[in-house]
Amino acid sequence: MNHAPHLYFAWQQLVEKSQLMLRLATEEQWDELIASEMAYVNAVQEIAHLTEEVAPSTTMQEQLRPMLRLILDNESKVKQLLQIRMDELAKLVGQSSVQKSVLSAYGDQGGFVLAPQDNFS
C-alpha cells in the first residue's frame, strides 16, 4: 500500500493547523489557541505513525522539507507570542499581589479614612 499521498495530505493538514495556531496567537485569541492545540498534537502523532509504518522516500522527503520549515517557523513565532503573553500575565499577577498587600495592610481601618489631626486649636 502506498502511503505517500496520505502522508503528504497529513503534512498539508498539519501546515493548516500550524497556520491557524499562528493566526490565533497573532490575534491574541488565547482560548481558541489552547483549544486548537489538541488537533495539532493529534496531527503530529498521525504523521509519526505514518512514517513509522513506511519511511518516506528521498523524493517525498524533499517535497515535505518546505512544509516542515514552515511549521517550525510558525511554531517559533507562536512560542514568541506566548512568551510575550506570559510576561504580560506575570506583570498583572504581580500588580494584583501588590494591590492585595496594600488592601490587606490598610483595609482593616474599619472603613474610616485616617487623616492627621488638626491640633492648632
Curated annotation (Swiss-Prot):
Subcellular location: Cytoplasm, Cytosol
Keywords: Bacterial flagellum biogenesis, Chaperone, Cytoplasm, Repressor, Transcription, Transcription regulation
Main location: cytoplasm
UniProt-listed InterPro entries: FliT
Pfam families on file: FliT
GO biological process: bacterial-type flagellum organization; negative regulation of bacterial-type flagellum assembly; protein folding
Cellular component annotations (GO), alphabetically ordered: cytosol
FliD binding: region residues: 60-98
Required for homodimerization: annotated segments: 1-50
Superkingdom: Bacteria
Family: Belongs to the FliT family.
Subunit structure: Homodimer. Interacts with FliD and FlhC.
Described function: Dual-function protein that regulates the transcription of class 2 flagellar operons and that also acts as an export chaperone for the filament-capping protein FliD. As a transcriptional regulator, acts as an anti-FlhDC factor; it directly binds FlhC, thus inhibiting the binding of the FlhC/FlhD complex to class 2 promoters, resulting in decreased expression of class 2 flagellar operons. As a chaperone, effects FliD transition to the membrane by preventing its premature polymerization, and by directing it to the export apparatus.
Protein name: Flagellar protein FliT
Provenance organism: Escherichia coli O8 (strain IAI1)
Taxonomy of the source species: Bacteria, Pseudomonadati, Pseudomonadota, Gammaproteobacteria, Enterobacterales
Gene that specifies this protein: fliT
